[in-house]
From Swiss-Prot:
<dbReference type="GO" id="GO:0050829">
    <property type="term" value="P:defense response to Gram-negative bacterium"/>
</dbReference>
<feature type="disulfide bond">
    <location>
        <begin position="70"/>
        <end position="76"/>
    </location>
</feature>
<feature type="signal peptide">
    <location>
        <begin position="1"/>
        <end position="22"/>
    </location>
</feature>
<dbReference type="GO" id="GO:0005576">
    <property type="term" value="C:extracellular region"/>
</dbReference>
<keyword id="KW-0732">Signal</keyword>
<dbReference type="InterPro" id="IPR004275">
    <property type="entry name" value="Frog_antimicrobial_propeptide"/>
</dbReference>
<keyword id="KW-0929">Antimicrobial</keyword>
<keyword id="KW-1015">Disulfide bond</keyword>
<keyword id="KW-0044">Antibiotic</keyword>
<comment type="function">
    <text>Antimicrobial peptide. Active against some Gram-negative and a variety of Gram-positive bacterial strains. Not active against fungi. Shows very weak hemolytic activity against human erythrocytes.</text>
</comment>
<feature type="propeptide">
    <location>
        <begin position="23"/>
        <end position="37"/>
    </location>
</feature>
<keyword id="KW-0204">Cytolysis</keyword>
<keyword id="KW-0354">Hemolysis</keyword>
<keyword id="KW-0964">Secreted</keyword>
<comment type="similarity">
    <text>Belongs to the frog skin active peptide (FSAP) family. Esculentin subfamily.</text>
</comment>
<protein>
    <recommendedName>
        <fullName>Esculentin-2SN1</fullName>
    </recommendedName>
</protein>
<dbReference type="GO" id="GO:0050830">
    <property type="term" value="P:defense response to Gram-positive bacterium"/>
</dbReference>
Length: 76
């Protein structure tokens, strides 16, 4: 009886350690997935800022050039 209890306790111990290792790996995989999402959101934000910045500077450049042409021709 004592031998059977020992072996059952040993199997329970091995199963617990195995389950613990699986949970740690699963947690590490979930953490890596979160980083990818963060990078994805950051790159999306970066691309949007670049697009709006480029268009905004282009429009500001046009307005500035028109204003300078107006001043040069004294038509303002």
């Amino acid at each position: 009886m004592f031998t059977m209890k020992k072996s059952l306790l040993f199997l329970f111990f091995l199963g617990t350690i195995s389950l613990s290792l699986c949970e740690q790996e699963r947690g590490a995989d979930e953490d890596d997935g979160g980083e990818e999402v963060k990078r994805g959101i950051f790159s999306l934000f970066k691309a949007g800022a670049k697009f709006f910045g480029k268009n905004l500077l282009k429009e500001a450049g046009k307005a500035g050039a028109e204003h300078l042409a107006c001043k040069a021709a004294n038509q303002c």
